[in-house]
């Protein structure tokens, strides 16, 4: 980001804080809004932002106070690898002229397939989108393992996934990007399996993106599962609505506070509220309450 864009963003953040009646923004690069925690709430365009074009998405994030966004693939914002160099600069400038941070890109690339040509296709696709992330001013791409195929030894698939992560991770590091591995997939979202994968990951640009699955609560429990992979946490976490279901979000926030986590907590909402901006504001209020606990 240029010095001009950085100053512009700082001005926008301070103006937003003043408009919300917040007098203690200080010199923080992003608005902590007087929270004790340094965690920040943002949005994944999974459902609530899927039909918003880019100007609308940025405007609605500004209105709600969710000042970070992970752009999901094949959504209405249209940020894909077919963008020209000029269009990529335009996307980057839109974010630079806003208090909203483009955290990264949410892809569906995965590397567990038995067909090695499909694995290679996913690796090369990841690299193309990592270049896009760099060009638009984002800092990384979300990928995932998505299962352990039947009929293949688990250890073989785990090693294949880790090897793929190492290849795309090396490429990401050269671009100054991160590979954020969503804890995902019928079997791979079980934390012992995710740990087994990361035990073979050698690139420090490859990070775990916690995903708030029911499997997190399997024995030996949330805290133990959290601790088993916290060494690899990056700067993104996916949550669902904080007031829906029975996932122990307050305990999770306490655990992240306990390790002084300073990354993005990204809302991957699944409900269909009549007013999504109002719903985003509500989630921010709940989040602030939980992170002040």
List each language-model region with its residue ranges.
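Active-site acidic/histidine proton-transfer and metal-coordination neighborhood
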Residues: 15-29, 92-101, 111-208, 215, ...
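Acidic (Asp/Glu)-rich catalytic clusters
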Residues: 36, 58-63, 83-103, 127-137, ...
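Glycine-rich, proline-tolerant flexible connector loops at the mouths of alpha/beta enzymes
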Residues: 72-92, 146-152
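Flexible loop residues that form catalytic
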Residues: 74, 110, 146, 242, ...
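Extracytoplasmic "Venus flytrap"
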Residues: 47-51, 76-77
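Histidine-acidic metal/acid-base catalytic patches
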Residues: 2-42, 49-65, 188-293
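N-terminal small/glycine-rich loop or linker at the start of catalytic domains
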Residues: 33-44, 102-112, 148
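Conserved beta-strand positions in the central sheet of alpha/beta enzyme cores
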Residues: 70, 104-106, 142, 238, ...
């Amino acid at each position: 980001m240029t010095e001009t864009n950085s100053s512009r963003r700082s001005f926008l953040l301070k103006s937003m804080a003043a408009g919300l009646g917040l007098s203690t923004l200080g010199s923080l690069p992003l608005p902590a809004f007087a929270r004790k925690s340094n965690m920040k709430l943002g949005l994944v365009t999974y459902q609530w932002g899927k039909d918003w074009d880019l100007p609308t998405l940025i405007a609605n994030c500004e209105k709600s106070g969710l000042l970070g966004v992970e752009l999901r693939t094949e959504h209405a914002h249209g940020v894909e690898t077919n963008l020209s160099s000029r269009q990529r600069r335009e996307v980057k400038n839109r974010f630079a002229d806003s208090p909203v941070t483009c955290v990264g890109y949410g892809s569906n690339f995965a590397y567990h397939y038995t067909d090695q040509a499909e694995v290679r296709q996913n690796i090369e696709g990841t690299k193309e989108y990592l270049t896009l992330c760099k060009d638009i001013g984002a800092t990384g791409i979300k990928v995932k393992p998505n299962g352990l195929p039947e009929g293949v030894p688990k250890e073989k698939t785990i090693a294949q996934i880790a090897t793929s992560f190492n290849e795309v991770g090396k490429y990401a590091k050269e671009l100054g990007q991160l590979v954020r591995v969503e804890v995902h997939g019928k079997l791979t979202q079980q934390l012992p399996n995710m740990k087994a994968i990361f035990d073979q990951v050698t690139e420090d640009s490859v990070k775990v993106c916690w995903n708030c699955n029911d499997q997190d609560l399997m024995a030996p429990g949330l805290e133990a599962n959290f601790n088993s992979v916290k060494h690899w946490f990056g700067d993104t976490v996916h949550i669902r609505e904080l007031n829906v279901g029975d996932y122990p979000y307050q305990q999770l926030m306490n655990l992240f506070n306990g390790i002084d986590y300073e990354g993005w907590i990204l809302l991957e909402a699944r409900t269909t509220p009549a007013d999504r901006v109002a719903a985003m504001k509500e989630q921010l209020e709940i989040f602030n309450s939980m992170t002040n606990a």
